[in-house]
Amino acid sequence: MQEVARLHRKVRNQRQNAHHQLSRRLVNQFDLIAIEDLKIKNMVRSPKPRPDPSNPEVFLPNGAAAKAGLNRSISDAGWAILLSMIGYKAESAGRTVVTVDPRHTSQRCVVCSHVARSNRAKQAVFKCQRCGHEDHADLSAACNILWTGRAQLARASVG
């Protein structure tokens, strides 16, 4: 039992150390840090059962096993702790942290602003259906998050 507790403590310390290093690097490197306002509770929700239309007593596969692994990964990441560290370090360093509505950040083209679910036909590739712009999906989403964060900050400073 003590061995298990020791291993859990070791993992917790490693995660906390990684969070401290990443948050320090971000705060030292950037004046503005824009973060998606993700609802983690919604992200780790279990998939709904899918009843078989031809036999109501039987349920069809709903991807619950794969979703359970993703849920565990999301929960283990400790995002709330990382965001908290970024927040207090940014405040003490005079940096700005902006939370951004996550809607359409991965579907909006950074070139022409066209929003379509079909812009993300593949998980890792973004390809705009209007202008043809192609990019890594995560990079495109990060640019949209930053752009939205800058726009929010500009609106807040004006009015």
Question: Model-found features: residue ranges?
Answer:
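Positively charged, helix-rich recognition surfaces that bind polyanionic ligands
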Residues: M1-G159
